[in-house]
């Protein structure tokens, strides 16, 4: 089954809402419309930028989408500081990242919470981008495949086969995030194939064949082509490079099958 690549730009805690408008305009200006037929492009700004991005995307009828960096497992109530999927849906979010390694590390989120957040996203018509990945010690011990498969199971626990079939999975080796170190294309393929094989067991081989599996970890315009050329890698969760409008547009074009003219 042909899977349309997805390039998702995770801005993390960067850019205020004025800067967000400028960056989205830069991406839209730099990426010719023809590429959107071959690649889905989404930006993942901070919560405080979402309304400004929504207004720009809707007003200018831009073909890129946007999403949130997190979502609460709760729909409403006395949960100070939490952001409901209902709110994100009203803002037009297509995606919500759940289980990012920085959330797991700094906020001690475990697989059960990630699964609950993924379920909450689905309740509100939002596609979760479920992140998994190993630390360097796990990689060096040669247990990276088993680690990621186990984390995948836990992070999707309780979801239906149909929901799993609609999710996006992002493999992000923790040792490669923001470090400049990148998993080799063959390494990314090894884990992403194992992920897809496990998805086939958790849902069905037919559904798994259509699930997009992304790679995340120091992706840029120089390495994205080799990474997304792998059979089981369907795009990238991009960090620092997504803050550069021209570079993000270029790597999106490369993922679509051709460099910018």
From Swiss-Prot:
EC number(s) recorded for this UniProt protein: 5.3.1.1
Keywords recorded for this protein, A-Z: Cytoplasm, Gluconeogenesis, Glycolysis, Isomerase
GO CC terms: cytosol
Intracellular or extracellular location(s): Cytoplasm
Top-rank taxon, per record: Bacteria
Active site, UniProt feature: 100 (electrophile), 172 (proton acceptor)
Record-level GO BP terms: gluconeogenesis; glyceraldehyde-3-phosphate biosynthetic process; glycerol catabolic process; glycolytic process
Main location: cytoplasm
Catalysed transformations (reactions): D-glyceraldehyde 3-phosphate = dihydroxyacetone phosphate
Residues that, per the record, bind substrate: 10-12, 178, 218, 239-240
MF-aspect GO terms: triose-phosphate isomerase activity
Protein's pathway: Carbohydrate biosynthesis; gluconeogenesis; Carbohydrate degradation; glycolysis; D-glyceraldehyde 3-phosphate from glycerone phosphate: step 1/1
Family: Belongs to the triosephosphate isomerase family.
Role summary: Involved in the gluconeogenesis. Catalyzes stereospecifically the conversion of dihydroxyacetone phosphate (DHAP) to D-glyceraldehyde-3-phosphate (G3P).
HAMAP family cross-referenced by the UniProt entry: TIM_B
Quaternary data: Homodimer.
Protein's recorded name: Triosephosphate isomerase
Taxonomic placement: Bacteria, Bacillati, Actinomycetota, Actinomycetes, Mycobacteriales
Gene it is expressed from: tpiA
């Amino acid at each position: 089954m042909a899977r349309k690549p997805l390039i998702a730009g995770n801005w993390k805690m960067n850019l205020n809402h004025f800067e967000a408008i400028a960056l989205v305009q830069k991406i839209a200006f730099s990426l010719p419309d023809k590429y959107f037929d071959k690649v889905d492009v989404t930006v993942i700004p901070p919560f405080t930028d979402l309304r400004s991005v929504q207004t720009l995307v809707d007003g200018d009828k831009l073909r890129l989408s946007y999403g949130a960096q997190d979502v609460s497992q709760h729909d409403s109530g006395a949960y100070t500081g939490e952001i409901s999927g209902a709110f994100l849906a009203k803002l037009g979010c297509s995606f919500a990242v759940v289980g990012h390694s920085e959330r797991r590390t700094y906020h001690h989120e475990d697989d059960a919470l990630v699964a609950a957040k993924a379920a909450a996203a689905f309740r509100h018509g939002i596609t979760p981008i479920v992140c998994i990945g190993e630390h360097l010690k796990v990689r060096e011990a040669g247990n990276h495949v088993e680690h990621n498969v186990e984390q995948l199971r836990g992070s999707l626990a309780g979801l239906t086969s149909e929901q799993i079939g609609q999710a996006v999975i992002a493999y992000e080796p923790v040792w490669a995030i923001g470090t400049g170190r990148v998993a080799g294309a063959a390494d990314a393929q090894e884990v992403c194939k194992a992920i897809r094989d496990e998805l086939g067991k958790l849902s069905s081989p037919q559904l798994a064949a259509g699930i997009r599996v992304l790679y995340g970890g120091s992706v840029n315009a120089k390495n994205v082509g080799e990474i997304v050329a792998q059979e089981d890698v369907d795009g990238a969760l991009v960090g620092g490079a997504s803050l550069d409008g021209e570079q993000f547009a270029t790597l999106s074009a490369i993922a679509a099958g051709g460099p910018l003219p």
